């Protein structure tokens, strides 16, 4: 056997198992996982046109981030996978916990409270019906 054949076997196995669904990921979004999930739960399983309408009129801050991310996933589906927009729907959407920025808030009598500014990683995966 040739030298380095294990890496070649692993590379071939990874190519076979590669996920071909169009997706987009937003890392280090300055919104907490809980607040992002409120918006993601509203669009999960919907077709992309309906989801864009829901996001356009949703007053939450996370909806503007997710709307931009969804448009990116739609563009990936069109350009990279050659899928038509009419048949696309949101198969998976989830938010994972990211790092937390810790800040100090001065309080009375020399005390200090910790403020945690939470981040999340938001992922949207589309598929065709």
Indicate residue ranges for each PLM-predicted region.
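Ribosome large-subunit tunnel/peptidyl-transferase-proximal elements
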Residues: 2-95, 119-129
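Strongly charged
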Residues: 98-129
């Amino acid at each position: 056997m040739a030298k380095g054949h294990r890496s070649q076997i692993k590379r071939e196995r990874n190519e076979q198992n590669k996920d071909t669904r169009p997706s987009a990921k937003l890392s280090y979004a300055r919104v907490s996982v809980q607040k992002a999930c409120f918006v993601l739960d509203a669009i999960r399983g919907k077709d992309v046109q309906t989801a864009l309408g829901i996001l356009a009129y949703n007053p939450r801050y996370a909806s503007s981030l997710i709307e931009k991310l969804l448009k990116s996933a739609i563009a990936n589906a069109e350009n990279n996978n050659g899928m038509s927009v009419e048949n696309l729907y949101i198969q998976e959407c989830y938010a994972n916990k990211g790092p937390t920025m810790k800040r100090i808030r001065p309080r009375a009598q020399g005390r200090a409270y910790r403020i945690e500014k939470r981040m999340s990683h938001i992922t949207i995966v589309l598929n065709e019906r």
